[in-house]
């Protein structure tokens, strides 16, 4: 077989590769050691740039070596002439571009480029925008490059309209571009700022309708791509609610004033200050949260001195001023009354969704019908199903309540991995609907039984509720936010899966608590109930703790004020 090329065996090939790797490793370690020695000795010269170039050219993610290069460049700035420094910077920019070709998603390389350009007196931002465009042509989802482009656009004061046009070009080329859609959500509010009186964070209606048409084209082209669906969800999002005092409640019995707000706030911080006026005179009080935790909360309360509740006067006027929101609310406590309150006459638009014009309602109704048609063609498309639900919520949550629940069942079957999330979202929507119905009826009783709830939310909306029925659901716990229900007298929570009562604390009016057929294991889990001073009736039938020896004696010691315990 003379004259034929000898072919290496697999073992020989493996050995050759091993030797090659060892040689590269030795060179890598040798260069790295030399860099660190020079750095320790303070020899920050161009030889360090050469050594680090050898390493970073192959592995741009060595962050420490980028730090070394910055130290060298800072040193050379004081030693080089302007012409020499310009040549050095030009070479550094070229080296950075070569590193990005090795790894276009190198954190260290992009950061070093930002640092370098930030030190130049007159950077060539046009060149940097072209660089971004080239790398985004290779990978339009490179979020490192997108971050860098936003940095460049900010530094160069590129008009938002030009950047929006750039996203148009990329989206037109490929709808599946989450970064482009996200960038649009940042640019459009800059291009179309709302007046001070308008809803902040939202778009003018004509712009919104055009964007809805664009994104609809995207998800009809590729129904399974999630980026357009997420952008569509942002478009449907409600505006940031205006700061408001939702409800003000005064109790003579508890000598307490309670306030609920449109958003969580931390009273006592530099920006969040509450002032209390009683009969037009300022009163210094200490504010606290219902659950005693010093953290942002929708509900805050304070104790009132006896003088401010004197029943000899015909009435007392309480006014709370929220300085950050520049809003205030007042209520009157009449002689002979044990409580007084003032509550916003809220509508569903103010509480949970945006108010829709006739034109926008027509467009959303058309979108809903189109999504239903798409769902018939793509019956297992989870994004389409979820969007149908959200469109129904945006249009009329009460009108579409029954249909929405049916779509939730379909969505859970299509996407079983997110069943828990969908159960919680469904619970949230059901509770919102129940709050709306209660608002319209102007009652203080809320029935949430047999709704298959898995979570409780919006409890700050229930400040005035006296009777709450949560029985026959799938609740595993009662959240600390339950302490916001300062007027609650009767709580029915039987036939759930409740294991903890940590949230049932500091309810000053709670008299009856029904917890039949839950999963309460030990008497110790009832300890939080000791903070409810008026609790007299406690029904624990059907819970595992009822089987404990001497349970009645333990409960009598644990909850001495409860006169009737059913086990």
UniProtKB/Swiss-Prot annotation:
GO CC term, one of those recorded: cytosol
PROSITE patterns linked to this entry: LRR, PFTA
Keyword Repeat recorded: yes
Keywords: Leucine-rich repeat, Phosphoprotein, Prenyltransferase, Repeat, Transferase
GO terms for biological process, alphabetical: endoplasmic reticulum to Golgi vesicle-mediated transport; protein geranylgeranylation; protein modification process; visual perception
Pfam families named among the record's database cross-references: LRR_1 (PF00560), PPTA (PF01239), RabGGT_insert (PF07711)
Phosphoserine modifications at: 98
Residue runs in coiled coils: none
Regulation: The enzymatic reaction requires the aid of a Rab escort protein (also called component A), such as CHM.
Repeat positions for PFTA: 44-78, 88-122, 124-158, 159-193, 207-241, 363-397
Gene3D superfamilies: Protein prenylyltransferase (1.25.40.120), Rab geranylgeranyltransferase alpha-subunit, insert domain (2.60.40.1130), Ribonuclease Inhibitor (3.80.10.10)
Oxidoreductase listed as a keyword: no
LRR repeats: 442-463, 464-486, 487-508, 509-530, 534-555
One term of GO molecular function: zinc ion binding
InterPro entries in the cross-refs: Leu-rich_rpt, LRR_dom_sf, Prenyl_trans_a, RabGGT_asu_insert-dom_sf, RabGGT_asu_insert-domain
Family statement drawn from the similarity comment of this UniProt entry: Belongs to the protein prenyltransferase subunit alpha family.
UniProt cross-references to PANTHER family, sorted A to Z: GERANYLGERANYL TRANSFERASE TYPE-2 SUBUNIT ALPHA (PTHR11129:SF2), PROTEIN FARNESYLTRANSFERASE ALPHA SUBUNIT/RAB GERANYLGERANYL TRANSFERASE ALPHA SUBUNIT (PTHR11129)
The protein, known as: Geranylgeranyl transferase type-2 subunit alpha
Organism: Homo sapiens (Human)
